[in-house]
Amino acid sequence: MLVVGPSGAGKDALLGHARRILADDEAVLFAERIVTRPNRTGNVTHVEMDALNFELKSENGEFGLYWAAHGNRYGVPRSAFDVLEQGVSVIVNGSRTVVDEARRLHSPTLVILVTASADILRERLHARGREQFEAVPRRLVRAASLTVKGDDVVELVNEDVLEDNAERSVTLISGVSGC
C-alpha cells in the first residue's frame, strides 16, 4: 500500500495514527523511510541519512523504491518488501511520482491519495514551519500538477477531523491486510 499526496495533506499524521492502532498487527508492516533531511519533528518517522550515503545505497540497489522531491532524496529499503511474499501488507509513505514504479515492482498496489484544498495545504505548510516561506507556493503548484489515477487509487480528503480520517485510513489498511 502506497500512501501519497501533496505536502501538508496530512500523510504523516494519518500514518502515525494508523501505526499506533495497528502496532501489534503482524499482518502489517509500516516501512521505514530513509530521507536526506534532518528528522527534527516527533511526528515524522524517518531515518536521516546524508546525501553521499544515500547515493551509495541507491547505486547498490538497496532501495525498493526511491525518489527525489523538494531538494531531498527519499528511499524505502528493499528489505521492507521481502515480507510481501509472506502475506504481510507493507505500508509506504511515498510519493505520487513513484506510483507507477510501485505498481510495476510490487503489484498489486493499493494507493491511498491523501488530499486537501489549496487553502488548507497552505495553512498547514505555514504552520509546520519546515518550509521556507517562499517554498510554499512551489509546493502548492506541485500539489496541483501531480495527479494519480487508477482503479487502485482511493482518495482520502483530509480536511476535517483528523481522528475520522485516521480511522478511515486504518479501515483501508485493515481491509487490505485482512485484519
Please give the residue ranges for each predicted region.
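Hydrophobic anchor at the beta1->P-loop junction of P-loop NTPases
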Residues: 3
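P-loop (Walker A) phosphate-binding loop of NTP-binding proteins
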Residues: 6
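ATP-binding Walker
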Residues: 9
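Walker A/P-loop
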Residues: 12
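Post-Walker A helix-loop "phosphate-sensing" segment adjacent to the P-loop in P-loop NTPases
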Residues: 20-30
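ATP-dependent small-molecule kinase phosphotransfer cores
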Residues: 33-90, 94-96
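Conserved phosphate-donor/acceptor-positioning beta-strand/loop module used by diverse small-molecule
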Residues: 90-95, 105-126, 156
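NTP-dependent small-molecule kinase module
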Residues: 123, 130-131, 148-179
